[in-house]
Amino acid sequence: MFVPRQVKAVANVNIELLDLMYFQNSYNVPYRLKKGGDIEIKPILVKDYPLYEWSMSVLNIKKNEINDIEIIQMSYLDFLVNKLFVQDENELHKLLNIIRLCLGYESVSFDKDKGKICLLLCNKEGIIEKVINSKEFDDIAKIILFQNDFNYDDRYINPDVEAIMQEYSKVKYGDINNPTLEQRKAFVSSKIGKTFSELNEIPYREFDLVYHSALNGEIYIAQKIIQGSYKYDVKEDIKHPLFEKKKDPYSEVFDDPSVLQNKGIQGASQLNTLNFNESQKE
């Protein structure tokens, strides 16, 4: 029987390797702590996704873009505990939700180890079982975000480019309705014959991939029907979305700046002078 090896706390989490070994198979990701042994990072189930979706923002705040040298110099965990949670208790509840759903612990606390903030995972009796330092917290947060979203992307984007991209998405897709999770479950249920109760127990990442696969199949068939109709002149052959080259969401705005220019969006004219690759931090 294949037993995936444990992930050690190293300088950089190898997401590509984790994807091959764990994410694609909906396995828990084992992570070895310096203190407290091992923990398992569990994928989010469909039934828990709404709460996870509300809570996940606490893991990817762009701390280093805040104009405060003290905050920039802090670890992410230190920033959460000593800045964010003091200002907004809801942010603390978000982290507690993430820890319960992904790590399986209901009781947590914070303390210092060698002057640095640590996250303590406790059992029901309040006894400390795991100690997560700031570097390990960063690793675990990164694993959680990639584990539960097939399309998650943590590349650095120049703030000016990102602002233009947000306007681009708002203008181009503003009139498109995003189906609710309930509607997506109904669609998937109609395709694979599983009840809502059965779908609720599927890892969300798996469910989301099935949803988009089924949706793309319908779009492909509809487009092929249009292509075969004498009423429409479709010059290019239509490929199934599964075989199309994956589009870079960050590059799309550079390929089609006219969307923003036609709307008179400020900054659209700058797209020709901005180089996306050079805008990224090494």
Residue ranges and their predicted role:
Residues M1-S75, S134-Q227, E282:
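An amphipathic, hydrophobic-aromatic interaction surface with interspersed Lys/Arg
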Residues D38-I39, E106, I117, Y230, ...:
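Compositionally biased, intrinsically disordered low-complexity regions
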Residues E201-A268:
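Accessory, usually C-terminal, subdomains that scaffold auxiliary metal cofactors
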